[in-house]
Amino acid sequence: MDRVVLMLSVLSLGVSSQPITDGQRLFSIAVSRVQHLHLLAQRLFSDFESSLQTEEQLKLNKIFPDFCNSDYIISPIDKHETQRSSVLKLLSISYRLVESWEFPSRSLSGGSAPRNQISPKLSELKMGIHLLIRANEDGAEIFPDSSALQLAPYGNYYQSLGADESLRRTYELLACFKKDMHKVETYLTVAKCRLSPEANCTL
């Protein structure tokens, strides 16, 4: 009986002959967390669009934010550059993106249980990425451009807005949040894949 239990325990770690390291385990947790946040962002954005009148949807679709506040953070411009980037670089960019949402995410909270998950989930993800950075650093300076970590909140974040501007701000925040969580999910997935030499990390 003990032998069967031992065999099941080994199989539960996966079919790979390679042991699962602490780094792989941390990456799996981080990827799972950002996937949850990305799905949550997609759901919130979809629910928000569904709540709009047709005229409001058309108006907001015309101003879809091509530029988000976090675009000040230098990141790979395409999938090829992403694949060429080092694990440490991808982790560093992911950390900056998550950190840039610490203040704006408060505006997304409230009103529903899913919305109230955003800030604590971001904090958990940020801590996990920080641990991964420390585990992968090799003496290089992780954040050479400290200004990137001090991004100002979205321009009208603290202002009292009229109904139309408030609607636009919410739309922009949700759209940019969805965009950035997709970026972080991509970067962490590629970085995690690098730990498995046999894996195909093609995007």
Swiss-Prot record:
The UniProt record lists the keyword Signal: yes
Keywords: Disulfide bond, Hormone, Metal-binding, Pyrrolidone carboxylic acid, Secreted, Signal, Zinc
An example molecular function term from Gene Ontology annotations: growth hormone activity
Subcellular location: Secreted
PTM-bearing positions, type Pyrrolidone carboxylic acid: 18
Signal peptide (residue range): 1-17
Pfam families (UniProt xref): Hormone_1
Keyword Secreted in annotation: yes
Positions annotated to bind Zn(2+): 36, 185
Entry's Gene Ontology BP terms: animal organ development; growth hormone receptor signaling pathway; positive regulation of growth; positive regulation of receptor signaling pathway via JAK-STAT; response to nutrient levels
Main location: secreted
One annotated Gene Ontology cellular component of this protein: extracellular space
InterPro entries: 4_helix_cytokine-like_core, Somatotropin, Somatotropin/Prolactin, Somatotropin_CS
SUPFAM superfamilies assigned: 4-helical cytokines (SSF47266)
Cysteine disulfide links: 68-176, 193-201
Functional note: Growth hormone plays an important role in growth control and is involved in the regulation of several anabolic processes. Implicated as an osmoregulatory substance important for seawater adaptation.
Family per similarity comment: Belongs to the somatotropin/prolactin family.
Protein name per Swiss-Prot or TrEMBL: Somatotropin
Gene for this chain: gh
